[in-house]
Amino acid sequence: MSSVFTVKIVGPAGAGIKSGGLLLSRILLSHGQHLIDYSEYPSLVRGGHNTYQVSFSHQPVSSIHYQLSLLISLEPNHWQLHKTELTKKSLVFGPDAPLVLPLSDLVKPIGGHIYANTVALGVIAYCFGFDPSICHSEIINTFSLDSPNLTAFDAGFQYAQNNFIQYQDIFKIHSNAPVKRALIVDGSEAFGHGFLVGGGNFYAAYPMTPSTGLLHFLAQKQLTHPITVLHPEDEISSASLAVGAAFAGARAAVGTSGGGFALMNETVSFCGVANLGVVFYLASRPGPATGLPTWTAQGDLLHAVFSGHGEFNKIVLTPGTHAESYQAAIEALNLAARFDVPVIVLTDKLLAESSASFTPPTYIPKVVSSPRHLPGSDDSFYMANSYEHDQNGFSIEDASLVKKVVTARLSLSKKIVKYLPKPVFYGSDQAKTLILTWGSTKMAVLEALNMLDNPSKIGLLHFPSLWPINPNWALMFKPFKNILVIENNATSQLSTLLASAFPFKPTSTLLNCDGRPIYPEQIVKYLKPYVS
């Protein structure tokens, strides 16, 4: 396995933790590094404890790591919260850290503590052997040619040069040429790119962490793309606007998180009976209720699958990476148009708000549409009725006719299954143990498999879609002695869902419910009995 480095910047909200971190990611990309980053923050505007961390390598890296190469604290009393993440080789900088960095003194002549994050970047650049000219270029691109941030970066670099010479290039990176067309996008932005490429032209949302990034991204794109983006007064209005847009012929989507999606459930049901294809971007966070608004979890799988009252068709997609988020947007729009059903794209805070190096595909995707008459057509009309209705949209109550309509509607699921993205297997044909996972946990599992001394004994099966379930999935488990389920919730909702479709009981599960991601180091430790 190639060397993967992990840097973490910590401090209070308002100290520029994320802005400094994103600048670091751009510097890494310019050095030809593959990366994935992630921020954690409380529900506070100022104070508290915020973090930004990035894991990177000259070869592809799938997940953030738990163990740190370098930790840098912008204020006192912060680095101590991360002692369990340190190793004997970790470097720790800060005002009260083992390697003292007097940020207050360094930023005083520059303009104050607002520049502490860029001073920190200078120290990081020194330890990793970054090219200062490349760092200067990224700072200029982010700020301006005469930005004090240039002075701040040089102050940090020079201080490290004068005081930490023993750590010069200690983590020397293997520089590559920058990847052409590579972007740094978070999961919501990746979905947004796919939404635009897939012909999406209407989006409505009421801000709710962690889905808000998609609203911000698409709102900016109104200036350059034929898309309407609305921010109404609440989640019910958002969903209703998307339904109206779909009725009028738009390729429409709405975004929210768990609590907002709970309010939208009647709209999901309406789409199911009125044959309206709307995409729901559901970025989950820990519940119940307000829960942990700025943390991550995979606790909404069953909520998504069984959303809406009554029995009707819906589709649930569960992308696991930034590239899959891009693809899921295109697939969701096409599936919604092909089958005229609600499509839920289920992600979480980890994927929605982590950023990764990503190169958009150059191909133009096929845009699927369903032939139907739109409101205002001269020769006909279409009624979208929330009552049970016949094929012309007229309400019905006759027992035999109702049974016929319901049976015909539900039979569509057999056709839908054929168009869904299939489970993807990673690993050796010799594997005797199979890991099942869905959504963002795929990233940590892939990274863990890359860290194992004997990965040939373990396989991974990732589900990029989970509803409708294909009963034939059960056949994929038969060759394996052990079936393990890894997901970021307390009750193993994937196990519950699979057991509802066919006999299923995993050998073991690795679950998490503290609002933090599952890290590859945890998975490696968990897998030890299965690789020995």
Functional labels for PLM-detected ranges:
Residues 2-67, 198-233, 436-443, 448-452, ...:
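Anionic-ligand anchoring segments at beta-strand to alpha-helix junctions in alpha/beta enzyme folds, i.e.
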Residues 96-141, 489, 493:
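Short alpha-helices
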Residues 1-15, 22, 32, 141-306, ...:
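Thiamine diphosphate
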Residues 82-99:
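ADP-ribose/adenylate-binding Rossmann-like module
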Residues 177, 184-198, 328, 333-532:
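Flexible, low-complexity linker and terminal segments
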Residues 115-121, 132-173, 369-396:
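Cofactor-/ligand-binding subdomain signature composed of acidic, glycine-rich
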Residues 71-73, 122, 295-342, 531:
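Conserved thiamine diphosphate
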